[in-house]
Amino acid sequence: MGKLLNSSVKKRSDEWYTQAPLVNLIKEYLKLPDKIWCPCDSDKSEFTKILNPAKHTTDDYFKHNFKGYAVVTNPAFSTIRNFYKLLREQGVEFAIVAPQAFLANPTVAKDIIKGEVKAVLPTNSIFDRPDGSEHKMNVFILTNLEMRKDYDYPKSNTQVEPYQIKGSKYYCFNRTQTFRDSGFKRGWIPVTGIIKTKLNDFKIIDYMQYVYTLEGQKKFSRYLVEKKEK
């Protein structure tokens, strides 16, 4: 990950480095263009090694204009919100590693619902720490690139039991956290958001409170939404 000159708060996860398997997954499943920029990586990063030739920079990556390149990298998680905003403002192609909790960002959720970006290749990946130890974390790739081929999602051995939302006819499955019903309409989309998420452009069909927690606190709810007609 690059230097955090743009952020005054540094998280421990900012010093985690992506191992080769996750980069190989990106290379295998995404249609990567010829010109790639890895702005959060050094020449020793697995991104620059595997995606070679790829431009890389180790200074403050917020100073650069990435037009003409596809940005493929693992940004410091403490800066990912502003980094994602920068990429969207510049209108460039990108594929960035993001923590699972980033799906709760209202801007990201709306961009996914509009089909402008997608969250793909969810994995429980291993990252290297500066002290030589390793850490596992649930991440996904946030991208506006096309898929090269379909991703065969790992199957879970966990038995999935549906449960009904109180006072509702819609069902949710524990593992997939997806609303299901025989009358499930095309155009209804399940999304995760912070508890008080405002979805002004969408009609909320139903919701589940407190589906996910973060650092022991109940932070996220699950919504079933439909885009409002203008």
Give the role of each language-model region.
Residues M1-V72, A76-K230:
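Class I S-adenosyl-L-methionine-dependent methyltransferase catalytic core
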